[in-house]
Amino acid sequence: MKMDADSSGTQHRDSRGSRSRSRREREYHGRSSERDSRKKEHKIPYFADEVREQDRLRRLRQRAHQSTRRTRSRSRSQSSIRESRHRRHRQRSRSRNRSRSRSSERKRRQRSRSRSSERRRRQRSPHRYNPPPKIINYYVQVPPQDFYGMSGMQQSFGYQRLPRPPPFPPAPYRYRQRPPFIGVPRFGYRNAGRPPY
């Protein structure tokens, strides 16, 4: 692209050919009448601050383009028609099935299942329902006479208690004697060598 002093790059700015306009260009140049009509109807802004409101609208407009839905959206009326038709068909087939013998019905079901499984496999959503693993508690029995005396639970008649209460737990090894060296007391409230009064 040749650039002289006077040629601004506007003529041929897009290196990919003018096929793709930027979103901003599209917003400002395309469908002006539509935009004006949209501006005319007055909506109460979410933010009182103008700049924030503009920003919010722009973000909303951007988000409207990215959609994560893979299936084509269908109109409500269509889906309801289809559903009612489906229901009617099911009822009709059910009433017909009652008269038939069970075995032929079973055969037919197996045949149809084998045929339709390929079709169904693709339609199932990729995120299947995975329940969290169930935690099962098993209660282990402890012979109660051992258990009651030790844990200090309430003693009921009929359970033997231990002949004498368990001895005091031994002192930890380090302080069986006086600790070997006590540093200089820092004269704080807790550490002072004498009580604080």
Curated annotation (Swiss-Prot):
Changing residue 94 to M: In strain: 14021-0231.6. Residues 163-172 have a biased composition (Pro residues). Residues 58-75, 84-127 have a biased composition (Basic residues). One of its GO terms (biological process) is mRNA splicing, via spliceosome. GO terms for molecular function: pre-mRNA binding. The keyword Nucleus applies. Its main location: nucleus. It comes from the Eukaryota. InterPro entries: Tra. Residues 1-17, 24-39 have a biased composition (Basic and acidic residues). Pfam families: Transformer. It is found in: Nucleus speckle. Keywords: Differentiation, Nucleus, Sexual differentiation. Induction: Transformer protein is only present in females due to sex-specific alternative mRNA splicing of tra pre-mRNA. Female-specific alternative splicing of tra pre-mRNA is controlled by Sxl, which binds tightly to a characteristic uridine-rich polypyrimidine tract at the non-sex specific 3' splice site in one of the tra introns, preventing the general splicing factor U2AF from binding to this site and forcing it to bind to the female-specific 3' splice site. As consequence, only the female-specific transcripts are translated, while non-sex-specific RNA expressed in males is not translated. Residues 1-136, 158-197 are annotated as: Disordered. One of its GO terms (cellular component) is nuclear speck. Member of the regulatory pathway controlling female somatic sexual differentiation, regulated by Sxl. Activates dsx female-specific splicing by promoting the formation of a splicing enhancer complex which consists of tra, tra2 and sr proteins. Together with tra-2, plays a role in switching fru splicing from the male-specific pattern to the female-specific pattern through activation of the female-specific fru 5'-splice site. No known function in males. RS domain directs localization of proteins to the speckled subnuclear compartment and the purpose of this localization is to allow colocalization and co-concentration of components of the splicing and splicing regulatory machinery to permit relatively high rates and/or efficiencies of reaction and interaction. This is Female-specific protein transformer. The lineage of its organism: Eukaryota, Metazoa, Ecdysozoa, Arthropoda, Hexapoda.
